[in-house]
Regions:
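Short loop/turn segments that connect beta-strands within beta-propeller blades
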Residues: 4-6, 51-55, 100-104, 158-162, ...
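Blade-loop segments of beta-propeller domains
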Residues: 8-38, 42, 65, 243-247
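Surface-exposed loop and turn segments in beta-propeller and other repeat-based domains
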Residues: 11-22, 62-70, 106-130, 163-187, ...
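Structural signature of eukaryotic scaffold interfaces centered on beta-propeller domains
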Residues: 27-32, 75-81, 127-140, 187-198, ...
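Asp-box/WD-like beta-propeller blade repeats and closely related beta-sheet repeat scaffolds
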Residues: 43-88
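Beta-propeller blade signature
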Residues: 98-101, 218-234
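Short, conserved, GDST-rich strand-edge loop motifs in beta-rich repeat architectures
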Residues: 204-222, 269-272
């Protein structure tokens, strides 16, 4: 952990595992406020909460939460408030699953907005895999935004009035094949890598390369170069082309800068200034 924006080292947290039961494979990390961080391990179906992440404090594991079995290997999550969180529903029955802070399923909501409703009905788990999404809440928790990893689709869900806005770009919905075992196998493009909702806009990093073209590349670099900026009505307002592919983003609107992770180099944190 580091201070921001000075990036002064504070401390490290998370015990180094000495066996399979002690290893944490982090799918995502969310800052929970009050010097705490939440870590999702999808392979174990668990959430870990670390406290004391601040100068002068000693970080420690405070909660080890086993998620309800209804969560089928969660790959992303976000805190929806002080008493609950949301995870994409990988069963295909709905779009989201909501849980309390003990990992118990509260309810499910919304549906995957696929055009082929017949395919959803017949192969729901495969569709959920093909529509794997990254999610982000707005700071006030009023908007929940999703972007699809395998398609050019962005959805905005208003938590107050139930309004749903669906944006489909030129590259269309996720393309995938359904195997005889019922799995969804990618067949089209690599699209969104990350999304962040701020007080004013939605920022998402987008690739768009076909898998067939990626396979031909001699030196494949993971990530995307295109930064898209949407308003809260789902309208694309700006596009920036970065000088390298990145996988994760953090936008500091007040500081007019973008922080991104470049996993293809040893210097993995890069900074961009924008208007």
């Amino acid at each position: 952990a580091f201070t921001y924006p000075g990036f002064k080292y504070i401390s490290s947290f998370g015990k180094r595992g000495e066996g399979p039961e002690e290893m944490i494979s982090a799918e995502n990390i969310r800052w929970g406020g009050d010097n705490t961080a939440w870590v999702l391990d999808g392979s174990k179906n668990r959430l870990f909460r670390y406290g004391g992440i601040a100068p002068g404090q000693e970080p420690k594991l405070e909660e080890n939460i086993s998620l309800d079995k209804a969560f089928m290997r969660p790959l992303d999550f976000d805190l929806s408030g002080a008493d609950s969180f949301v995870i994409p529903d990988y069963s295909g029955e709905n779009r989201f699953s909501w849980a309390d802070m003990s990992g118990n399923l509260l309810h499910k909501s919304d549906c995957i907005p696929i055009t082929d409703e017949k395919q959803l009905k017949e192969s729901a788990p495969a569709v959920a895999q093909g529509w794997r999404s990254f999610i982000s809440f707005s700071p006030d928790k009023k908007l929940l935004v999703t972007v699809t990893q395998l398609g050019d689709v962005l959805d905005i869900y208003n938590m107050e009035n139930g309004r749903h806005i669906n944006y489909k770009g030129e590259d269309g919905e996720p393309e995938f094949h359904v195997t005889s075992e019922g799995y969804g196998i990618p067949a089209g493009r690599m699209c969104y890598y990350d999304v962040q909702v701020t007080e004013h806009y939605i920022y998402a990093i987008y690739d768009g390369r076909k898998f067939s073209d990626i396979m031909k590349e001699k030196e494949y670099k993971q990530g995307a170069k295109q930064l898209r900026v949407f308003d809260f009505d789902g309208k694309l307002r700006k596009e920036y082309m970065l000088d390298r592919p990145v996988t994760g983003i953090y936008v500091d609107e007040a500081g007019h800068c973008l922080w991104a992770t470049d996993v293809n180099t040893d210097n993995q944190i890069v900074k961009y200034i924008f208007d």
